[in-house]
A protein has these predicted regions:
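Surface-exposed helix/loop patches within compact recognition domains
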Residues: 13-116, 171
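Compositionally biased regions
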Residues: 91, 120-121, 161, 169
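Edge beta-strand at a domain terminus
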Residues: 111-114, 127-171
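Short, well-ordered strand-loop elements centered on a beta-strand within folded domains, enriched
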Residues: 57-59, 63-67, 123-128, 154-156
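Boundary/junction segments of secreted and surface-exposed precursor proteins
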Residues: 1-8
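A mature extracytoplasmic/lumenal domain signature
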Residues: 51, 120, 128-132
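A short, structured loop/turn motif at beta-sheet edges
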Residues: 116-124
Length: 171
């Protein structure tokens, strides 16, 4: 299961008028509990900055690649930022959530491609071919409906983006 968020021209104050979206995909053993916190074990892929043309509001079909250009059909690779001694993941990354929280970890998508096809019925077929942390290959497929949420009207560019709360912290 998964969903996409639309943030509009999120980087317009930096001169980039392209639209920005995010994508969050989950393996089947992860679910939301009564408090809307993520529970279970599995993988949780987050891609925060996926760029599309100014006329696109849904995640368009096409071939995407990791690049720092902000051009349509690119996404930002994953990075870890330190802010007040707190690690903050950004860009494209994946949580590996294990039953033993000490074994859970984050891996960053440092390179790769993503191919998106959309059927006439609105079914998204997403093929990922990523390199994690500069060495490990990750290939995966998502095929399902993909709800899109419009965050453009409610999220000023200076605000943080929406993420699901994890039941246990992952370092």
């Amino acid at each position: 299961w998964g969903f996409a968020d639309f943030y509009g021209s999120y980087y317009s104050h930096y001169g980039n008028r392209n639209n920005t979206g995010s994508l969050q995909l989950f393996t089947g053993n992860l679910f939301l509990n009564e408090e809307s916190a993520l529970e279970g074990t599995g993988q949780y892929l987050i891609m925060e900055d996926i760029f599309s043309a100014p006329s696109d509001t849904l995640l368009p079909a096409g071939n995407y690649r990791a690049a720092e250009t902000g051009e349509p059909f690119t996404f930002y690779a994953g990075k870890k930022f330190e802010d007040n001694r707190e690690s903050i993941p950004s860009g494209a990354f994946i949580y590996y959530i294990e039953s033993d929280p000490t074994k859970s970890k984050i891996a960053y998508v440092t390179d790769g491609t993503m191919k998106i096809n959309v059927s006439s019925e609105g079914i998204y077929d997403i093929q990922c071919n990523f390199t994690l942390d500069g060495k490990t290959e990750l290939k995966g497929t998502f095929k399902s409906e993909l709800p899109h949420f419009d965050r453009f009207a409610v999220t000023p560019a200076s605000a943080s983006r929406h993420r699901l709360k994890l039941q246990s912290p992952v370092n």
